[in-house]
């Protein structure tokens, strides 16, 4: 028996998130159906992260066991032949039988795209958050520094989530001005709470429009109260960019 790790990209627009659910279209559901056609048996997959409805991925990691005598390139080709056109397997690698994509991950990198322009761009409306009000990039960069390091991110978790351990370590947050009015927010950390990155982006935008000062990020972190933080940024601007092991 082999264990394969697949590096997967997908357009999350027409998926109800990654995790398999009954009677709705999910990335994991499509992935497992493709594997079952190839392997002729039920297959359970494990991923590095569970993206929400509308969230995209460039480098999601999906792991599964295979009883066929098949090489990596042949498995990649077989999977892409059986997957819909909004999922693409970029690479397949054989890994140790004890490898676990969630627990062995050392770093997860998320990208969030904002289209900062007075006029919308219809061709990227599913792939970036259109924000028509001017954003102060320098202030957003200053604010981003307050997220770095180990903090209790209870103020930036999903509302209604009652998990006890909400302490997370953020390695780096970068705010980059790209061409064409695109702002890229890059967040790196080992693990994240649900909606955490989108809530962080919402806070940075609040700083960008001048409603908060950069140091208000630190104040809200200390409050440990989701109701005191900013609104959640929409899902379609978020990408699981890469996972490092």
Curated annotation (Swiss-Prot):
Keywords: Isomerase, tRNA processing. It holds the Pfam family PseudoU_synth_1. Belongs to the tRNA pseudouridine synthase TruA family. Substrate binds at residue 110. The active site is at residue 52. This is tRNA pseudouridine synthase A. HAMAP family: TruA. SUPFAM superfamilies: Pseudouridine synthase. It catalyses: uridine(38/39/40) in tRNA = pseudouridine(38/39/40) in tRNA. NCBIfam families: hisT_truA.
